[in-house]
Design a protein with these regions (language model features):
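Extended amphipathic alpha-helical heptad-repeat regions
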Residues: 1-238
C-alpha cells in the first residue's frame, strides 16, 4: 500500500461519507418531523378524551339521571284506586330504579376495563420515557469519549509526525467498513420512517374522525336534554 493508493481510497471514502451525511441528516430531520406529528396526535387524542369523558360522558349521565327522575316523578303523580294499581306504581318505580342501577353497573364495568387499559398504556409510556433517558445517557457517554479523544489529540497523542502508510491504511480500511455498515443502517432507518409516517398519518385521520363523531354525539345529547326538560315541564303541569 502506497501513500497515493491511500489518498485514492480516502477520496472514495469521502465521497461516500458526503452521500451518507445527506441520508443520515435527512433521516434526522424526518425523524423529528415524525415525532412532532406524533406529539400533535397525542395532544389531539387527549383533547378527544377530555371531550368524550369529561364532556359527553358527564352530559349523557346527567340525561340518564334526569330520564329516570322524570319517570319516577310521573309514576308518583298517579293516584292508584286499588291495591293492584298501587302495586303497579310501586313495581314500576322499583323497575325504573333497577334499570338505572343495571345500566350504571354495566358502565362501571366499562370504566374499570378502560382504566385498566389506560394503566397499561401509562406503563408503556414509562418504558418509552426510560428509553429516552437511556438514549440521552448514551449521548452523554459518547460526548465524553469524544471529548477525551480531543484532549488526547490536543495533548499530542497520535501526532501527525508519527503517521505511517500502513497505519493510515488501517484507518482508511476501518472507515470503509464503517461506511458500509452505516449505509445499511441509514437505508433501514429510511424504510422504517416511511412505514411509521404512514401509520402516524392513518392515526391522524382516525383521530379527526373521532373528533367529528364526538361533536355529533354532543349535538344528540343536547337535543335529548331538551326533550327531557319538556317532559319534566309536562309532569310538573300534571
Amino acid at each position: 500500500m502506497t501513500a497515493e493508493e491511500n489518498a485514492k481510497n480516502i477520496a472514495e471514502n469521502e465521497a461516500r461519507i458526503l452521500e451518507l451525511e445527506a441520508v443520515v441528516l435527512g433521516n434526522k430531520s424526518r425523524a423529528f418531523d415524525h415525532r412532532s406529528l406524533i406529539e400533535e396526535n397525542r395532544m389531539m387524542l387527549l383533547s378527544n378524551y377530555t371531550a368524550a369523558f369529561a364532556g359527553n360522558r358527564q352530559l349523557a349521565n346527567m340525561n340518564t339521571y334526569a330520564i329516570f327522575s322524570n319517570r319516577i316523578a310521573f309514576l308518583r303523580t298517579l293516584s292508584p284506586e286499588n291495591d293492584v294499581q298501587t302495586n303497579f306504581v310501586n313495581s314500576q318505580i322499583n323497575k325504573a330504579r333497577l334499570d338505572a342501577l343495571v345500566h350504571r353497573a354495566a358502565l362501571n364495568s366499562k370504566v374499570i376495563e378502560i382504566s385498566a387499559r389506560m394503566a397499561e398504556i401509562n406503563a408503556q409510556l414509562i418504558d418509552v420515557n426510560r428509553a429516552i433517558m437511556q438514549a440521552n445517557e448514551e449521548i452523554v457517554a459518547f460526548n465524553g469519549a469524544q471529548l477525551a479523544a480531543n484532549s488526547a489529540m490536543i495533548a499530542g497523542e497520535h501526532s501527525m509526525a508519527e503517521a505511517t502508510v500502513s497505519a493510515n491504511a488501517v484507518v482508511i480500511s476501518t472507515n470503509a467498513e464503517i461506511i458500509a455498515d452505516l449505509g445499511s443502517t441509514a437505508s433501514e432507518n429510511s424504510a422504517k420512517l416511511e412505514e411509521h409516517l404512514t401509520k402516524t398519518l392513518e392515526n391522524r385521520e382516525s383521530i379527526s374522525q373521532n373528533k367529528a363523531e364526538i361533536s355529533e354525539r354532543r349535538t344528540k345529547i343536547i337535543a335529548n336534554r331538551a326533550i327531557i326538560a319538556s317532559n319534566r315541564a309536562k309532569i310538573a303541569r300534571g
